[in-house]
């Protein structure tokens, strides 16, 4: 897959097909982009579950934060990665292990080797994009 360009149809299929999104790197700090994007996803009807080992057990946007994807007690459709590119591979590998269907790496986050590992086992991958930008750009209504 060409990760420099995604068709609107590809992004739309992903965003219309997912329900539960684990936000890896979610922050309890309101000024952090991960906090705002998680809240945006919730307002649009997605179940957004925070994952951050530094905030495990805390509540972020009304949801319990988990220390790792494997601790989330329900199936995860998509993993939204708010980590530096150098740390994204670990989140992708965890997404593979827990059976997520999609890995979405946020703006500025790209790991081609991790993307290849995910795609090799059937996951869809998006890199260097933000769902909170793509949802309104595509005209997707709240769920």
Give each language-model segment a name.
Residues 50-51, 105, 125-128:
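General beta-strand structural signal in soluble alpha/beta enzymes
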Residues 134-143:
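A charged, well-structured terminal subsegment
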Residues 17, 74-78, 99:
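Alpha-helix C-terminal capping/helix-to-coil transition sites in glycosyltransferase folds
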Residues 95-118:
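ADP-ribose/adenylate-binding Rossmann-like module
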Residues 1-7, 58-74, 80-89:
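Glycine-rich, highly charged phosphate/nucleotide-binding loops
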Residues 74, 111-135:
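Short acidic, glycine/proline-enriched helix-loop-strand junctions
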Residues 29-32, 39-59:
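NAD(P)-binding Rossmann-fold cofactor-contacting core
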